[in-house]
Amino acid sequence: MRPVFPLILSAVLFLSCFFGARQTEASASKRAIDANQIVNRMSLDEKLGQMLMPDFRNWQKEGESSPQALTKMNDEVASLVKKYQFGGIILFAENVKTTKQTVQLTDDYQKASPKIPLMLSIDQEGGIVTRLGEGTNFPGNMALGAARSRINAYQTGSIIGKELSALGINTDFSPVVDINNNPDNPVIGVRSFSSNRELTSRLGLYTMKGLQRQDIASALKHFPGHGDTDVDSHYGLPLVSHGQERLREVELYPFQKAIDAGADMVMTAHVQFPAFDDTTYKSKLDGSDILVPATLSKKVMTGLLRQEMGFNGVIVTDALNMKAIADHFGQEEAVVMAVKAGVDIALMPASVTSLKEEQKFARVIQALKEAVKNGDIPEQQINNSVERIISLKIKRGMYPARNSDSTKEKIAKAKKIVGSKQHLKAEKKLAEKAVTVLKNEQHTLPFKPKKGSRILIVAPYEEQTASIEQTIHDLIKRKKIKPVSLSKMNFASQVFKTEHEKQVKEADYIITGSYVVKNDPVVNDGVIDDTISDSSKWATVFPRAVMKAALQHNKPFVLMSLRNPYDAANFEEAKALIAVYGFKGYANGRYLQPNIPAGVMAIFGQAKPKGTLPVDIPSVTKPGNTLYPLGYGLNIKTGRPL
């Protein structure tokens, strides 16, 4: 019997951390200066500046031939921050390459905004959407869904938050609480916790609380839900056709739970929801009538989110340069429409990459001023938005700034925190726990190679095969497996040929990674067509050819699903099949994500995978049937369901 006291103690410590965040916020608000008084002293231009959050991902200084990644503050960018008094800046991977450089940059940003500190934001979701060059990336939300642990979710949020705080970043556009109930979704997928509303709500809430524990402003996204779409709003305008009853029961459910628990921010979705707003607008792209997306809808932002769901925090748009908005609405017009709808912060309202383009900011401000002047936007609405922004800055310790350390001291502290051994250990442990065994017939796993055995590594891209290779080298170095011979095969856009079959035939073991964004194999008469010559189908055709060759030559073969686990349905004939929920590999001397190494550890019996599916995997040969249901996963040793 397991000792009870350690379990009780860990639970008490966890819950004390969870609820302690509320106490910290409450005490901070008591000693804070009054946000309303600050707003009353601001000019209209200053207030409107607070409602804009541009990016300076790349910058072209005078005399340079093209924009370059902005990793170091310069006088030109600093002058724009001071002039327009922006409420915040969003940072991208181009801006946060090393710990030292990032701390220096964020410090310089704040020095350029002496009146009211900036919200310095980032998309550090964990998993496939991460920006920090030297941070702890974690296996991602769907891996958390497979692990099914509130403590792991809280720990993930807390560690990410701790690293961001050390770097001077105070706002994280995370967690994603979209319910991924559409297997054809091209943009959410493993960024979602689950297709189950309860699991998504629970893990989203605890991730949010982990971030807030570190005084990071957390933004739920993408409201009212981007999970049941088959179009990526970066490239098109998606539509969700469900009725209000279904949307309230499913899509809105995780948002409501997190709002009730004290959400700081909500990020909008550039998605059409005719059940909530069927207003049409003439597209600037082709003159057609289109439904107004949620980001620009007053019925959704004010009527639904504010009034019906009771959200009193900060609403921020998704990036306004995404094609769902940029293709159909004018730049200034989109910002005005978003603010009219009830949004507080316009994210990336204009793309400015040099001083020559500065007037784009001026035009956005002027358009907003004119909307206030002519009564389209009441000034009291502007005041309310800015008061919410300032209140959040106070609540999360941005204003007044708490950290009085020198830049040198901040860098020294950050280097001890960001990507620390302790954090990487937690990341590794979670990734290994999340690995989900879907098949292990004839005890194919774990592989037990003899000295000199030949292992063939197959994956679409070089960094993925490199990750598998490096993990095997690490196992050999630690004497967990005997020295083996490795060969690699990268198959992106490739056709399976005789030389590939020869490599399979010569191997003693074969590890194959499948990487699919949208799973759409060609099926004829209930069978996957492996003869298809369409070059766009390589992601399915090639790994299936490897599998079939391995079966023909009686070679131990394991298929590792690297991204959305729906592609597992393409390999029913395989005897061993696992899902790891993350595809990033190994480059520049570091693992970009812990998922592939965790899968390799499981394959060689050096980890104990405990994951169960957070989504249903539909059959591709029998439409309407579920091949592997939500909650399915096998014990790798016994082959029995967990």
UniProtKB/Swiss-Prot annotation:
Effect of H234G: Strongly reduces catalytic efficiency while increasing substrate affinity
Membrane topology value: Lipid-anchor
pH and activity: Optimum pH is 5.8-6.2.
Disulfide bonds: none
Active site positions, chain numbering: H234, D318
UniProt pathway annotation: Cell wall biogenesis; peptidoglycan recycling
Biological process according to GO: carbohydrate metabolic process; cell wall organization; peptidoglycan biosynthetic process; peptidoglycan turnover; regulation of cell shape
Binding-site list for substrate: D123, R131, R191, K221, H222
Residues of the signal peptide: 1-16
GO cellular component, one term: cytosol
Induction cue: Up-regulated during the late phase of exponential growth and during stationary phase.
Lipidated positions per record (N-palmitoyl cysteine): C17
Pfam family, one: Glyco_hydro_3
Reaction equation(s) it catalyzes: Hydrolysis of terminal non-reducing N-acetyl-D-hexosamine residues in N-acetyl-beta-D-hexosaminides
Site feature (Important for catalytic activity) residues: D232
This enzyme's EC code(s): 3.2.1.52
Main location group: membrane
Localization per record: Cell membrane; Secreted, Cell wall
Stated role: Plays a role in peptidoglycan recycling by cleaving the terminal beta-1,4-linked N-acetylglucosamine (GlcNAc) from peptide-linked peptidoglycan fragments, giving rise to free GlcNAc, anhydro-N-acetylmuramic acid and anhydro-N-acetylmuramic acid-linked peptides. Cleaves muropeptides, but not peptidoglycan.
PANTHER family given in the database record: BETA-HEXOSAMINIDASE, BETA-HEXOSAMINIDASE-RELATED
Homology family: Belongs to the glycosyl hydrolase 3 family.
Name of protein: Beta-hexosaminidase
Gene it is expressed from: nagZ
